[in-house]
């Protein structure tokens, strides 16, 4: 086992898996190579490998920012956290995760659900992801209580533009949403 753990292929395999989890489905080779070197130099110290990953400039590259897709459960939990939703019926998280394609305890492989965007994204799952967001905002999920006013210092946005800007900044803080906002506003104005 010690020989296997010290083999460069093991280091590369583990570095690739970690980088795929945290950076992108196809992580940058430079990051993986540095992580593998750290793995070998530290006798497999995962903490040091992860530090190498987050210290690498490619980890913070804007191009990689939008490459990771959350699993349905991760999406549900992050939406609940971002909106400050009070959950008194947690089974709804599992119900919605299942609607979005992640049925707990029913994936046959012992490795668990794949950590790849292609597994989670298709027409039906995208629609259910949007429906989940709409259901939270519209208070349509039993046992979920979202106070949208609290997200905007307890007052309603003064216009549709203000609402779009306020909630986009809150829910998508690191992305430039100008193009999407303009598209949405053109649709709203046309109605």
What are these regions (language model features)?
Residues 1-7:
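Active-site cores of enzymes that catalyze phosphoryl transfer or operate on phosphate-rich substrates
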Residues 7, 11, 15-42, 51-191:
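Flexible, low-complexity segments enriched for small/polar residues
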Residues 47-49:
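Alpha-helical scaffolds flanking conserved acidic
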């Amino acid at each position: 086992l010690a020989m296997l753990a010290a083999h460069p292929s093991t280091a590369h395999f583990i570095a690739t898996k970690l980088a795929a989890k945290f950076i992108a489905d196809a992580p940058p080779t430079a990051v993986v190579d540095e992580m593998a070197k750290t793995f070998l130099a530290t006798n497999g110290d995962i903490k040091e490998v992860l530090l190498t990953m987050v210290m690498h400039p490619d980890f913070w590259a804007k191009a990689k920012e939008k490459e990771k897709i959350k699993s349905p459960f991760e999406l549900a939990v992050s939406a609940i956290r971002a909106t400050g939703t009070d959950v008194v019926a947690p089974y709804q998280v599992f119900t919605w995760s299942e609607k979005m394609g992640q049925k707990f305890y029913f994936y046959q492989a012992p490795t668990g659900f794949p950590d790849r965007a292609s597994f989670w994204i298709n027409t039906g799952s995208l629609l259910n992801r949007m429906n989940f967001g709409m259901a939270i905002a519209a208070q349509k999920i039993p046992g979920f209580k979202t106070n949208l006013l609290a997200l905007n210092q307890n007052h309603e946005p003064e216009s549709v533009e203000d609402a779009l800007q306020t909630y986009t900044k809150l829910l998508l803080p690191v992305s430039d949403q100008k193009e999407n906002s303009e598209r949405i506003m053109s649709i709203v104005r046309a109605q």
